[in-house]
Amino acid sequence: MDLDRLKDLIKKYRENMKYYHDTKNAYNETECRDEYINPLLECFGWDVQNVQGKLPQYKEVVVERFSNYSERPDYTLTLNGVSKLFVEAKKPSVDIVVETEPAIQARKYGWNANHAMVILTNFEDMLIYDTTIKPAPGDNARTALYRKYYFEEYAKKFDEINAL
């Protein structure tokens, strides 16, 4: 858990935010994951790079790679090899607070795995959904929303987020 690193990440994002939202720059999800979401998870104590050298079946974080369209979440957070939480990532230009499809996608992952919650993030926003509520036609991005954090809040609400 590294609060100083998190503050640096927030500062870097704030300084470059317009670039990430400009579709001409083609800043993509993979870049966002590498530059922001991986470090964000590490700031909250998750071993994304498997620095501990755990066997593949016991890694803390399983990262989905090399796919433009996947039916698996971008990250599976585990405890002793047992899936506990999914994190679905999007690029910053995707407005996850408003757009329905990313929310439904993330909620389906959590619902199908019988998880209590799922995280949807583009780094700028972190949405935590209650996945004990089945996704249904007509749902929107606010349906089953448990918590919402803006990137500027991550450091201030570090303990609250980490406790989830």
Model-derived features: positions:
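A short, conserved, highly charged catalytic patch centered on acidic carboxylates
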Residues: M1-M117, I128-A163
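Carbohydrate-associated surface elements
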Residues: F123
